[in-house]
Amino acid sequence: APLLGDKYSERCMFCTDDKHPNDLLEKGHIDYIVKRAIGLGVEPITAVKVACHNAARYFLLNNRGAIAPGYLGDFVIIDSFQDFNIERVFKKGELMVDHGVVKDFPAPAIDPYLTERAHSTFHVEHLTAEDFTDARPRGIIGMVNGEITTVDAGYSDRIDVEYDVLKIAVVERHKNTHHIGIGFLQGYGLKSGAVATSVSHDSHNIIVVGTSEDDCAAAANRVVELNGGIVVWDQGKPVAEVPLAIAGIMSDESLTCLLYTSDA
């Protein structure tokens, strides 16, 4: 909020990254950031300008980001600056959302070639426990709950669930190089099975954490079978999974369906 005073606000934009489906549905997107900024003392007009006009100007969308002659009629109507609840959404001057009810609109046309490519991004041979087995001592990554930073937790040459030392691996999945980086993780708290995901910035290879090499292999293989996603594997089967078949990082389901799947 201090950056959004008169001196720096012209050079600021709002953005989100990796918003969970429930966050989007329950809290919102850029509108939620605007609401938070206003709550932290930013002038409402400044917050809206940063969200709309600054972003449009940066991306050279010169006919968007403001309500003025020559601009597209893309705008929202809110109840108040204090609450900032969006009541109506207009796109090119046409009412598209009215108090939460979305008007039907045609899906965008996507080249079939691009669709096929986006659903065929995993090039990984079948993985086995041996692929995750390495007797050499490896560094232990110490997780810090709620923080992006980690700590050096020493070394290990084996999994030790009692002391929360788990196997962690990164499996290259784009070019079938069979490159697998292996290490250990402490602080995750997993007691059985494994968790694997293809959402792993920025290369989005497969990351798997497990209590055994067999579970690591099984969870990673299941991610490949799904063409991407998040898998919780335990006792020889997937106990929870969220398919992300578009490039391994996005769902082709509706927001409501994805919310139900991820909550389950």
Describe each model-derived feature in a short phrase.
Residues L3-F84, F90, D202-V209, A220-E225, ...:
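His/Asp/Glu-enriched, well-ordered alpha-helical/loop segment
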Residues K19-P21, F81-D83, E94-M96, V102-K103, ...:
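Short, glycine-/Ser/Thr-/acidic-enriched flexible segments
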Residues A56-R57, L61-L166:
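Hard-cation-handling environments
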Residues D98-V101, H179-L185, V239-A245:
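Short amphipathic beta-strand/extended segments with alternating polar/hydrophobic composition
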Residues A129-T211, D215-A218, V224, G229:
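Non-catalytic interaction/regulatory modules that flank or connect domains
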Residues G229-Q235:
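Conserved short beta-strand edge segments in small beta-sheet-based binding/regulatory domains
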Residues Y260-A264:
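Conserved small/polar residues in nucleotide/adenosyl-binding loops
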